[in-house]
């Protein structure tokens, strides 16, 4: 007998499309076989395309076994080199995951300054970032494009311009775990030097892959051992992984550590789905679903959004709203087969709920996931009156 499966509407992992789910159910392939090399070659090329980077820019994609968090370690270990000329990092924090990135950087020896918004649920004012850049010399600025703890969306284009005008030598680093695939993202145009994401959110693949893209400028820095010294890491070393990725993209098998072949096969299908639909259309679909869902909760049910809504500070792949009794609402939805998430921000965690709307739940309007979720939240709140 088949057991019914709950509708998963947390901010990742997300519900997979039928084709992506099916791509997991394939026999194991040799990781240097012609069949797998062809798949991985396409994945690397399409990864660059989804980040909006041209091959001519000589940006380098990396797809490794691991979670999105591994991306922090990859950047930190290849930036904080033994002879790194500038270990100062400005972290633009809009929530829990921004702060965790800062903790990761400190663990490698970075000198970290953190700039925060005036109020939880808002983005950091651009003038505060510019002021910090004017006062201090930073080797890198990190921005969490969408902080999943608050559903705050940062304006990468504006921050990029501020860095270029105030401190052009500073690396621009973006945690795009909850934005690639659902938010406008322009790696080349915005001058991003290092961007990291994961497979299980808006990309629409299973959890288990850490996906990064490095600019040629950052690659020149990270690979220069004679000038900048050795890497404080082994698995995370770009010096070890770069020839592997270059060979796979050139259609040649290579080996450093065994890649998860089934996960990469499913990522291949997920990336093709995104590109076949079109990035701009996909961004629009996420925006439309997000606006409808937030408007229904904020204006329809008179709930307060954690991220300011309506505004350009509110993410399109998830919604965070304050409710009187989050555990009760979460339990009620669970009893009806819908799984949502609670809050995790250290200051407001017990006060709000989070709902993900990425991938098929946002892009396929024939599926009733979000309408059902809204109806259940409405019922849960009416029960408490």
UniProtKB/Swiss-Prot annotation:
Matching SUPFAM superfamilies: PLP-dependent transferases
Keyword entries, A-Z: Aminotransferase, Pyridoxal phosphate, Transferase
Q: In which pathway does it act?
A: Amino-acid biosynthesis; glycine biosynthesis; glycine from glyoxylate: step 1/1
Binding residues for substrate, per the UniProt record? 354
Its EC number(s) = 2.6.1.44
State the reactions this protein catalyses. glyoxylate + L-alanine = glycine + pyruvate
Q: GO CC terms for this protein?
A: cytosol; mitochondrion; peroxisome
**What enzyme class is recorded for this protein?**
transferase
Tell me the residues on which N6-(pyridoxal phosphate)lysine occurs.
Answer: 201
The record ties this protein, via InterPro entries, to: Aminotrans_V_dom, PyrdxlP-dep_Trfase, PyrdxlP-dep_Trfase_major, PyrdxlP-dep_Trfase_small, SP_NH2Trfase/AEP_transaminase
> What cofactor is needed?
pyridoxal 5'-phosphate
**Which Gene3D superfamilies did the record assign?**
Aspartate Aminotransferase, domain 1 (3.90.1150.10), Type I PLP-dependent aspartate aminotransferase-like (Major domain) (3.40.640.10)
Record keyword Transferase present: yes
Q: Name one GO molecular function term.
A: alanine-glyoxylate transaminase activity
Entry superkingdom: Eukaryota
Instruction: Tell me the null mutant phenotype.
Output: Alanine:glyoxylate aminotransferase activity is reduced by 98% relative to wild-type.
In the record, biological process GO terms are: glycine biosynthetic process, by transamination of glyoxylate
Q: Which family does it belong to?
A: Belongs to the class-V pyridoxal-phosphate-dependent aminotransferase family.
Leftover remarks: Present with 339 molecules/cell in log phase SD medium. Expression levels higher in stationary phase than in exponential growth phase when grown in complex medium with glucose.
User: According to its UniProt entry, what is the function of this protein?
Assistant: Has alanine:glyoxylate aminotransferase activity.
How the protein assembles, per its UniProt entry?
Answer: Homodimer.
Q: What name does UniProt use for this protein?
A: Alanine--glyoxylate aminotransferase 1
Species of origin = Saccharomyces cerevisiae (strain ATCC 204508 / S288c)
| Lineage start | Eukaryota, Fungi, Dikarya, Ascomycota, Saccharomycotina
